[in-house]
Amino acid sequence: MVLMIVSGRSGSGKSVALRALEDMGFYCVDNLPVVLLPQLASALAASNISAAVSIDVRNMPESPEIFEQAMDNLPQAFAPQLLFLDADRNTLIRRYSDTRRLHPLSALNLSLESAIDEEDSLLEPLRSRADLVIDTSEMSVHELAEMLRTRMLGKRERELTMVFESFGYKHGIPIDADYVFDVRFLPNPHWDPKLRPMTGLDRPVAAFLDRHTEVHNFIYQTRSYLELWLPMLETNNRSYLTVAVGCTGGKHRSVYIAEQLADYFRSRGKNAQSRHRTLEKSKS
């Protein structure tokens, strides 16, 4: 059974995550004090029910040792996993401005900006221990819920989920990536006026890239590298592997190569998925 501990900065999406986990059959508890985690797990152990518990800055223990002790006292039937949600400072400020809600640390007479910074410092012990950190800055509510469904179904089936994610460097590197590959040196379809409005999902762009030996070599060497270490990653008690592929705009080269890698590993029987950050962002 899984005990999913959901934490993160206020405004990053903990409530959304908890609702998504509840939809997946988890028994969910919001804002449970850390010291009560062993009691909750013991009560649920006989029912064979996976649980999800959210922890925010208000019920953090006074020291990291108390959290570690609570983890050590969990029943052996449970496999604890720590999910930490985060977002950049400006996004959190905007979300609070939109909802007009008070920050949990506002009772300390701190400004919103100071409360966000103080919370970041207080939650660092949990962030550093997290099994998965998700940056929700560019995510909608639905995208976050879908990502959790993808990741958790892989976890509950005890199968490594490989996520090949394209992105544009001008939009920033995904912080949830385990590996980042830069393909900005490869031939760029952007400079062909006919291909510029298309994406790496379109056949003419794929045909353009497929004509170049260096593109084939890059795909071959990248998949060979991943295949070399995949057996160790699969036995390392992890549920997902995120491989980010970046080009300048995240529209052509990175999309094509992410799709090629995902197709290759799917053909080898792996649970491989593709995600295109720039293309998804342009649709929203």
Curated annotation (Swiss-Prot):
GO MF term (any one): GTP binding
Keyword Ion transport: no
UniProt-annotated stretches for the region RNA-binding: 266-284
Any one Pfam family match given in the protein's UniProt record, by short name: PapZ_C
Keyword Manganese: no
InterPro entries: P-loop_NTPase, RapZ-like, RapZ-like_N, RapZ_C
Entry binding sites for GTP: 56-59
Binding annotation for ATP: 8-15
Keywords, ordered alphabetically: ATP-binding, GTP-binding, Nucleotide-binding, RNA-binding
Family statement: Belongs to the RapZ-like family. RapZ subfamily.
Role description: Modulates the synthesis of GlmS, by affecting the processing and stability of the regulatory small RNA GlmZ. When glucosamine-6-phosphate (GlcN6P) concentrations are high in the cell, RapZ binds GlmZ and targets it to cleavage by RNase E. Consequently, GlmZ is inactivated and unable to activate GlmS synthesis. Under low GlcN6P concentrations, RapZ is sequestered and inactivated by an other regulatory small RNA, GlmY, preventing GlmZ degradation and leading to synthesis of GlmS.
Self-association state and partner proteins as the record states: Homotrimer.
PANTHER family reported in the protein's UniProt record: RNASE ADAPTER PROTEIN RAPZ (PTHR30448:SF0)
Matches recorded under NCBIfam families: PRK05416.1 (NF003828)
Name of the protein described by the UniProt record: RNase adapter protein RapZ
Taxonomic lineage of the native organism: Bacteria, Pseudomonadati, Pseudomonadota, Gammaproteobacteria, Enterobacterales
